[in-house]
Amino acid sequence: EAGRSSVERLYVGSTFCSQYFLRQPRRVWREAFALCRRLGVPATLVVPVFSQKDLAAGCERIDRLVYGFGDVVDEITVNDVGMLAFCVERYGCSVNAGRLFSKEPRDPRYVRLFEERHTVAIPALLTEVFRRGEVRGIEIDPTHAALDLAPLSGLMPHIQVGVHVP
């Protein structure tokens, strides 16, 4: 909160590590959602990609968090197709495609690649899911100096794009 005039939303969970997500003590989850209540802000549950061995435990944890803290969790960010289908079908809240959902190429060894304008696109397999409006937002990394979002806007005029910056 330091240096910010206001907080609009709290992102709770993990983009990258399923073990971090699964091993987080209940106290930490309760404190995070209590902070949301105190500040009067909603929470986004950020869900990592689970391995097959952790999938059942991951789904169970998501159930407990969404149903147990549904008064503040109004959005879920997922990072793979399977979890997208699971969350869209099971929960009545907004679903976002996370940063790992559609990784863009980037490599710091190729400066020219970063300096180019890059068109952000969705794989053809997923365009119908996005077109139907089941995904409300997409998160991307600043992989290039300029990102062209026109194809996304044309495909999904309702979409909200979040760019993660350092």
Regions found by a protein language model. Name each.
Residues 1-166:
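Active-site pocket-lining/capping segments in soluble small-molecule metabolic enzymes
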